[in-house]
């Protein structure tokens, strides 16, 4: 909407992406802070509380009265702020909104099945959820390839030239990136604020890449690939950051609400999407290092138990391992935040070392 003030009335102030990104950030933050308490009251009245895994550490038992599905609120607030601030003829933005909304809807269906009395008390069956993720991922990848300026070239970090052209195989690769990132954030969302802050750090890094790649001068100077319109994604990124900060107001220790699958699946999928459009699919390993660490701990634990009948960790994901070892929840959370911050600072170095 604000961009059209520039077109209709010649208000040049609203033509700048950075200005509209700032507006979307504050709008999403304020909306989330306003609506989240109302949602918490509604969720408590409906007993929409976080289901606790029966084998989880003992200190988690007290969290079974904390509402979940907060992701629905902050995703809707982020989307509204974006619609209010971005150019709506930009396909990068529209596909990004689709990624956020579709994975949030999938997560909502799963959450609802777990907590609101649906017949399938365990939520969506894992195979059904996985198939639906692939369907959504492939649709979004096809839209990216055929309806944006994005090419199918494959890049690696710290190298300025593409390695090879993946052709139509890029569709499956992009879908895999989106799904992997989605599930990685979902696995990490096990402690108060643990997934929220690393997600914010990752989005800041990816937002910087998107803005610079959308600017002809900066992209040329930094030897970044340039795609028409990708800079506009900064508005959606800042909207989601603002919404996540608003959510963190209530999700920091001790949490008043959890994001649920409706939040973690959508945030992770969008991080994967941003990695794709900025050609940082491989650098996502560094940007989302905490998420990768959590996911690898699960893979190693399951593989070791199946092959050797022995566990590597006391419990997986790895944050539970440290809980059982006696680390306080606050200590685990803050240390993982520090790891995420350092990893993203390293990732930003890739802007110059190419």
UniProtKB/Swiss-Prot annotation:
Disulfide bonds: none
Highest rank taxon of the organism: Bacteria
Class of enzymatic activity (EC top level): transferase
Subcellular localization, as worded in the UniProt entry: Cell inner membrane
Catalytic activity: UDP-N-acetyl-alpha-D-muramoyl-L-alanyl-gamma-D-glutamyl-meso-2,6-diaminopimeloyl-D-alanyl-D-alanine + di-trans,octa-cis-undecaprenyl phosphate = di-trans,octa-cis-undecaprenyl diphospho-N-acetyl-alpha-D-muramoyl-L-alanyl-D-glutamyl-meso-2,6-diaminopimeloyl-D-alanyl-D-alanine + UMP
Record keywords: Cell cycle, Cell division, Cell inner membrane, Cell membrane, Cell shape, Cell wall biogenesis/degradation, Magnesium, Membrane, Metal-binding, Peptidoglycan synthesis, Transferase, Transmembrane, Transmembrane helix
Molecular-function GO terms, alphabetical: metal ion binding; phospho-N-acetylmuramoyl-pentapeptide-transferase activity; UDP-N-acetylmuramoyl-L-alanyl-D-glutamyl-meso-2,6-diaminopimelyl-D-alanyl-D-alanine:undecaprenyl-phosphate transferase activity
Pathway per the UniProt entry: Cell wall biogenesis; peptidoglycan biosynthesis
Membrane topology: Multi-pass membrane protein
Cofactor(s) recorded in Swiss-Prot or TrEMBL: Mg(2+)
Chain ranges passing through the membrane: 1-21, 23-43, 66-86, 89-109, 130-150, 161-181, 193-213, 230-250, 257-277, 282-302, 331-351
HAMAP family with a match to the protein in the record: MraY
Family per similarity comment: Belongs to the glycosyltransferase 4 family. MraY subfamily.
Function: Catalyzes the initial step of the lipid cycle reactions in the biosynthesis of the cell wall peptidoglycan: transfers peptidoglycan precursor phospho-MurNAc-pentapeptide from UDP-MurNAc-pentapeptide onto the lipid carrier undecaprenyl phosphate, yielding undecaprenyl-pyrophosphoryl-MurNAc-pentapeptide, known as lipid I.
Protein name, entry field: Phospho-N-acetylmuramoyl-pentapeptide-transferase
Gene source species: Campylobacter fetus subsp. fetus (strain 82-40)
Organism lineage: Bacteria, Pseudomonadati, Campylobacterota, Epsilonproteobacteria, Campylobacterales
